[in-house]
Amino acid sequence: MDNARRKTPARLDAACFWQIWQRFDKEEKGYIRETELDAFFDHLLAKSGTEDTLMEENVQKVKEQLMTSHNVSKEGRILMKELASMFLSEDENFLLFFRLETPLDNSVEFMQIWRKYDADSSGFISAAELCNFLRDLFLHHKKNISEAELEEYTSTMMKIFDKNKDGRLDLNDLARILALQENFLLQFKMDASSTEERKRDFEKIFAHYDVSKTGALEGPEVDGFVKDMMELVQPSISGVDLDKFREILLRHCDVNKDGKIQKSELALCLGLKINP
């Protein structure tokens, strides 16, 4: 395995690998089928832009080692992580997989990150702001990299996650980078519930977003709630839209105008009467 890794084309980076991978894993499940492996390697060789026989032999060796090792599941699935580790450097692997190791399960935490790095409150993350995010990320994981490498990795991340190629990332792009888990509110069916069930669900919902446990939603807690609420009816919202919806919610629910949404205020907005 080590020899095969050393001989595979070093020019392949995370962005290039991701571009090829997406052809086969369009739903981003994180694996491809064993039956798709030949086509995957054909695209890999074509993307490398060379007809080097030695390289083709090495790719074939990687495939053989992959099939003879325990990297193929009983269902015939091959994980992206297994293939990427054979072709990408340690740092390039890190760019693809750091988010899989520490996925976010709470929109409040996600919005804290969004607000921190959208420093100019434009509703987008620029390349410079993404660079700051990656710098902090590498430091958090105790990885030392040069400024030149940081610029290169920022460029790579933009290639991978800037879906509409406008040179900036929106809310949905960052959610993909951070592997934000499924919308918490999807599990609740408020309209189809009895009054008691709605009250019980409300308690769960409020507790989920009241991360600080103060009895009021404020700052990123409001942001997280608004994001999840709006995405129930509009699957893809921008940072600008989120700010608009946030203002509307505060205008309607923040009765005492303290910039927070008290538990009783949110209940009133949702047409519920709760015990003090």
Curated annotation (Swiss-Prot):
GO terms for cellular component: extracellular region; transport vesicle membrane. Gene3D superfamilies: EF-hand. Ca(2+) 5 binds at residues 210, 212, 214, 221. Ca(2+) 3 binds at residues 118, 120, 122, 129. Keywords: Calcium, Cytoplasm, Cytoplasmic vesicle, Membrane, Metal-binding, Repeat, Secreted. InterPro entries: Calbindin_Ca-bind (IPR051001), EF-hand-dom_pair (IPR011992), EF_Hand_1_Ca_BS (IPR018247), EF_hand_dom (IPR002048), EFh_SCGN (IPR035798). Ca(2+) 2 binds at residues 73, 75, 77, 82. It comes from the Eukaryota. It holds the Pfam family EF-hand_7. Ca(2+) 1 binds at residues 25, 31, 36. Residues 12-47, 58-93, 105-140, 149-184, 197-232, 240-276 form the EF-hand domain. Ca(2+) 6 binds at residues 254, 256, 258, 260, 265. GO terms for molecular function: calcium ion binding. It is found in: Cytoplasm; Secreted; Cytoplasmic vesicle, Secretory vesicle membrane. Ca(2+) 4 binds at residues 162, 164, 166, 168, 173. Disulfide bonds: none annotated. It is a peripheral membrane protein. This is Secretagogin. It comes from Mus musculus (Mouse). The lineage of its organism: Eukaryota, Metazoa, Chordata, Craniata, Vertebrata.
